[in-house]
Regions:
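Right-handed parallel beta-helix
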Residues: 156-160, 221-229, 239-252, 268
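Right-handed parallel beta-helix/beta-solenoid
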Residues: 118-154, 472
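Extracellular/surface-exposed low-complexity segments
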Residues: 121, 449-472
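Mature, extracytoplasmic segments of signal peptide-bearing proteins
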Residues: 2-15, 22-119
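Short glycine/acidic-rich loop motifs that flank beta-strands on beta-rich extracellular proteins
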Residues: 178-179, 201-211, 242-248, 266-273, ...
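Surface-exposed loop/turn motifs in large extracellular/passenger domains
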Residues: 184-193, 213-236, 250-260, 274-289, ...
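N-terminal extracellular ligand-recognition/capping segment immediately after the signal peptide
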Residues: 156, 160, 164-210, 239
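Extracellular beta-strand-rich, repetitive "passenger/adhesive" scaffolds
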Residues: 147, 164-173, 193-199, 225-227, ...
């Protein structure tokens, strides 16, 4: 009996050992083998493009800045761009570093508008101006200055395709063979913001004398100007007429501003054109603009044919007539025309026709307007009754011996007050006049002025309109 119990116990133990051994073998089969794993379980490799140097925000991706490497596909961020052809020529939307992969969100087809082609900031993001936030159109994304090529067509296309946008022109020379035109339609107008050294120049092939470099509001003519949103501007830049072109015409309607620009070598600097004989048309604010004309007998600095314009802080030289007004109710402040004795303007008969302010309007307003060396400072047509406050006429040279401060074609019906005229040389043969009139009997007044009545000629009529003695 005992032998049977022992035999049964042994059999049970042997069965248990066999079962446990099979379980261990099964577990070992499910474990990774230990030791060298080469050639077993390798991950998929891919070729990917990445940066090999740090680059700035807004930089262009070029062949020299990238490299291709092989990496484990599983290690790449989702959406990583693999092919180098998909990144070349793109622009970065953020600063990137060597070894960094390209994601679609980090690239754009066009350069951000507040940086140049080197990734340098054009205007600092200081809360005042930010080209990117403003949505300006960066012109040099579409054309290049300084190439010697005509960019007229390219600029015109850009204007036509970007209504109600502001176009930014960086520094450089933009050669034009014909005028650039903009629309007067409020739905199509554009504004221009120019770097101070963005230089527009008439080419040698410019054929039509006195056509302007820019015609603002020249197409889609309209009489709409009351809308508060109907305003467009031109700011900055240099406009060079090459002694054959005008600089800027303003046409159509609307409220327009021209600021911080330099104009040179032009037949006419700025011409504001009327739509009708009553002077209706655009209303323009010109502020801090310098003009140097072509120095020819047909040269003008500014011509205002419309009403209600404002000219402020301007210096104008090398024109036979600096400013001509046929419109009325214009306000002129702190303007300084200067006559330059250079051929053909240095001819005595030509000089006698020179005028700083030529006024054919019914009434215009002058404040702190002064001129040097023109034969006539202010000329008024027959029906003009303008007002001059704190104005100044000065002659530093006795050349050609004709010095008239104010000349009226007809009667004098204006107001001159707190103004002065001075001959800064001692030539006794010079004919000087404070006021000349074509007809007596006007109702104008001269109040609190500075000039020497002993220096004026017998033709001077100022004594008939003085309400107090001049100071000298």
């Amino acid at each position: 009996m005992k032998k049977n119990i022992f035999r049964n116990t042994v059999c049970i133990l042997l069965c248990l050992l066999m079962l446990s051994g099979g379980f261990l073998v099964s577990c070992n089969k499910n474990e990774e083998p230990s030791g060298d794993n080469s050639g077993a379980g390798t991950e998929e490799k891919v070729t990917v493009v990445r940066l090999k140097e740090n680059i700035k925000y807004g930089s262009k991706v070029t062949e020299a800045k990238i490299e291709e490497v092989q990496v484990n596909k599983a290690d790449l961020p989702e959406g990583t761009i693999l092919n180098k052809d998909d990144v070349l020529g793109k622009f970065t939307t953020t600063e990137m570093y060597a070894g960094e992969y390209f994601l679609p969100v980090k690239l754009a087809d066009k350069r951000p508008t507040n940086v140049d082609e080197n990734g340098d900031t054009v205007v600092e993001d200081d809360g005042i101006i930010n080209f990117l936030d403003a949505g300006y159109v960066m012109v040099t994304d579409y054309l290049k200055p300084d190439t010697g090529a005509d960019v007229s067509e390219a600029i015109q296309k850009l204007i036509d395709e970007n209504p109600n946008r502001t176009l930014y022109f960086p520094d450089g020379v933009y050669l034009l063979s014909k005028p650039i035109t903009t629309s007067a339609d409020p739905a199509k107008t554009v504004s221009f913001k120019l770097s101070n050294f963005a230089h527009f120049k008439a080419m040698d092939t410019w054929e039509t004398r006195s056509e302007p470099l820019f015609k603002l509001g020249a197409t889609d003519m309209t009489d709409e100007f009351a809308s508060a949103t109907y305003h467009y501007s031109l700011e900055g830049g240099i406009f060079d007429g090459s002694d054959k072109a005008d600089a800027i015409w303003v046409m159509g309607a609307g409220n327009v501003s021209i600021r911080y620009s330099s104009i040179k070598n032009t037949v006419v600097g700025i011409h504001v054109k009327a739509n009708d004989a009553e002077g209706n048309g655009p209303t323009v604010d010109v502020h801090t603009v310098n003009i140097v004309g072509s120095g020819t007998v047909d040269s003008y600095g500014v011509i205002l044919d419309t009403n209600d314009n404002t000219l402020t802080n301007m210096r104008i030289a090398s024109n036979l007539i600096a400013i001509k007004l046929t419109g009325s109710e214009n306000f002129l402040r702190n303007l300084h025309p200067l006559f330059i004795f250079e051929a053909p303007l240095n001819n005595v008969e030509v000089y006698k026709q020179s005028v700083a302010f030529y006024d054919e309007g019914k009434q215009n307003f002058y404040d702190n307007c002064y001129n040097d060396q023109f034969a006539t400072g202010f000329y008024f047509s027959k029906d003009t009754a303008s007002i001059m406050d704190c104005c100044f006429n000065y002659w530093y040279s006795e050349k050609y011996a004709v010095h008239n401060s104010y000349v009226c074609e007809g009667q004098f019906n204006g107001i001159i007050r707190y103004s002065s005229s001075d001959v800064g040389h001692a030539d006794k043969g010079t004919e000087c006049n404070f006021l000349l009139v074509g007809e007596a009997g006007g109702k104008g007044t001269i109040d609190t002025v500075y000039f020497n009545p002993e220096k004026v000629s017998e033709n001077d009529a100022s004594k008939d309109y003085l309400i107090n003695n001049p100071i000298y």
